[in-house]
Amino acid sequence: QDCIVHPNSVLGSDGFGFAPENESYQKIEQLGGLEIGDNVEIGAGCTIDRGAISNTMIFDGVKLDNQIHIAHNVSLGSNSAIAANCAIAGSTKIGKNFKMGGLSGVLGHLEICDDVTIGAHTLITKSIKSSGNYIGIMPAQNHMNWSKSAVFIKKRGK
């Protein structure tokens, strides 16, 4: 009820489900659906996959900017807002009041608690169990410099 879906968005498409078999891939039938709550706005060019087994869930009050991908079996909590060009991989469970800056991503099968803000261009690689602000921007540089920086940062964090 009271939802807005902008042009060229695809709702309920099959998730990316394939099983390797004899040096090729066999499509895994997607049996779930997609449920969208009230007062949701979905920007232009978004794709939201239906669930593989259970439903993909977009709860009340969610606001999605343009060109966002939400994969199969994701649960996106109420009153969440996601900026353009973000992706959330399959089977991720996200609490309410989630905010995600542009060009960010969340890996699959993670859980993110309520009241989490993700800064722009951040990749979430593990579950988040404490509310707060998270960011992980690292500007582009040649591979050798990046490798040295990554080792330095890891050592400093211990």
Positions of PLM-derived features:
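Structural signal for interior beta-strand "rungs" in well-ordered beta-sheet cores
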Residues: C3-N142
